[in-house]
Amino acid sequence: MEDKSLRKEASKNAWKQLYDITLKLDKLEPWNYLGDTQLVTIQLKDREEPVFCSVMGKFSGERGIAVFDGVEGLGDFYMILGSEEGDLPAQYLMDEHTSLTCFWGSMMNVPDEQRKVIDELDIRFKTISDWIYFVSYKKGYKPYQLDEDEVALLIETYENLYMVVEAVRQGELNPEIEQAEGIVRRYNTENDTWEMFVKEIPEAEKEFPSVMLEDQELKDELKNQKQIDLEVILDFTYLPVMVEGERPKNPLLFMAYDNTDGGVITMDILEEGDDEISRTLGFFISFVQQNGRMKTIKARNPWIFGALEDICEYCSVDLVYDPVEIMDQVIEEVVSQL
């Protein structure tokens, strides 16, 4: 849970600056010039890693600008981009990623806290379908209002993004989407100037840690357990309920399902301080000690593979990637009972 003392709300003046630059961007209609995969990489002053901007709306009806911070953020971008080809539920990916996103949308979709800011600044939009609002996404938390640091980051980012879009409009830069080209804007400290150029879009994969159980005595104990004719499915899902706090959290549910005889083996919410790796590994150790080595584990979530690849190989348990559609049914049933 976020420490209340660490969160600072943005001032009215900061919000005004953010809306001022966003309204300038709005007039340029950046979605007419950049596709959502044509990332704009901006290396801001005094920041070690760049930010990556994805402009949405050229190929869909939803207009917006998503900003991903650093290499980890770039991994989140590609994780979401690959959602249509993968097996992880779209809602899970939204709850799993971190970004600062601006939407152009219906007045009815504007969060209450954002509406208060808009009213206080007395901002008027063209139609009820053209309201501009901002959402902070953070892994494990509910979408929330931007804080002071996030507003400041977007102001600086959008000021530079404006220069990029204007250069594309004027024909000074011409990234080709078919060639997977984006744009880089960076500050040159040697000559104290900003430079912009077309470059191939950077690529990155979302990194998931993998672990090796170091307790050799425990590993041998697990390996020597009898093997039983059982196939187990493991999965994670974020529940659509809210855990109150300075920033409300998304409860993360761990599930183990008996895919041989049918039925849930265990289902529990991760506690404060727990994580996907420790919970998955903890289940494996406890289950094998009590019941024996399952024959197969099926999963679609990369956290599970990071936790179990090494120990499953050591214990001769097949760890298999599978869409595990049955878990979507289980999740739907769980959610319906909330």
Predicted regions and their residues:
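Secondary-structure boundary/capping micro-motif
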Residues: 1-254, 259-338
